[in-house]
């Protein structure tokens, strides 16, 4: 390939401690250290933080409480897993925290921006003008914002009717959590109500949400861990040059016709991607036509 640097934001602004933490999390030592922590009945995230604290100290463990640092550590772990020569670099997040409900000058979290735009408030001072224009256009077409509440009954009906064995094949399902999900689906009135009812110390709200939506979409744990293709949604002339020079390690989808060239396994993943896009469109007041992934053209800038 022709990528030599990966740049991402983080609360620390220093790559070294992120990579140090990633190296430990990528090691057999960590796999051994975390077992007694998980046995205490806490969530994986809490067990991981405690293992890091004991092995590397409180300062490094503190990184696992910061959302952007967590993501940066995962990037570093991926680089280690792939034995890649890519060098990670981080830019420090400033002014406001992840998911902050308050703005600071021209800075606002993405959560606050989504909240303000959903309520019809002006957001142009927090985003580039082109972004504001796109959001206004989507709002005019009633295709923004999206809310899972539009699908509450459909999701609950699908999950409650799902055989127990099928639910066990969904990623992240273990330790009998599928029984709690099916029981809650019989009485919950909303998806949020279902998530709240199933949540435990070990199973976070986010994890339950992933399980339920994966079940609804038909995502199972036998899918490949890595994507079986690269999908190009848009590119500049510079991007086209990079793709031309890059050594293709995976099939590239740049046009709808390219899907026909995929293997059966890759095509199955693409069909799930299409299903997820269709689901998203159903979460807006005015839905887009289904299966637009097969018709939309590559964006060239």
Q: What is each residue range found by the language model?
A:
Residues 1-301:
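Active-site cores that bind ATP or allylic diphosphates and position pyrophosphate for catalysis
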């Amino acid at each position: 390939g022709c990528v030599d640097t990966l740049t991402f934001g983080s609360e620390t602004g220093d790559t070294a401690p992120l990579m140090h933490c990633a190296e430990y999390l990528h090691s057999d030592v960590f796999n051994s250290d975390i077992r007694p922590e998980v046995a205490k009945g806490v969530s994986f995230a809490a067990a991981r933080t405690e293992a890091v604290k004991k092995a590397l100290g409180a300062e490094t463990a503190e990184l696992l409480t910061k959302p952007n640092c967590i993501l940066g550590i995962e990037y570093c772990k991926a680089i280690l897993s792939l034995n890649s020569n890519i060098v990670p670099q981080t830019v420090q997040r400033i002014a406001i925290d992840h998911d902050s409900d308050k703005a600071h000058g021209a800075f606002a979290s993405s959560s606050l921006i989504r909240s303000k735009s959903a309520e019809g408030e002006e957001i142009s001072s927090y985003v580039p003008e082109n972004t504001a224009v796109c959001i206004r256009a989507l709002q005019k077409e009633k295709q923004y914002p999206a809310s899972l509440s539009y699908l509450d009954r459909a999701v609950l009906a699908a999950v409650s009717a799902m055989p127990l064995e099928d639910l066990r094949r969904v990623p992240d399902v273990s330790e009998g959590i599928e029984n709690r999900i099916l029981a809650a689906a019989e009485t919950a009135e909303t998806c949020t109500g279902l998530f709240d009812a199933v949540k435990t110390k070990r199973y976070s709200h986010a994890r339950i949400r992933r399980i339920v939506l994966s079940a609804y979409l038909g995502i199972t744990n036998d899918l490949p861990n890595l994507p079986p293709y690269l999908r190009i949604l848009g590119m500049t002339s510079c991007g086209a040059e990079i793709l031309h020079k890059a050594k293709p390690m995976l099939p590239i989808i740049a046009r709808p016709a390219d899907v026909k060239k995929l293997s059966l396994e890759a095509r199955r993943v693409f069909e799930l991607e299409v299903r997820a896009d269709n689901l998203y469109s159903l979460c807006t007041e005015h839905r887009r036509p289904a299966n637009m992934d097969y018709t939309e053209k590559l964006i060239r800038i």
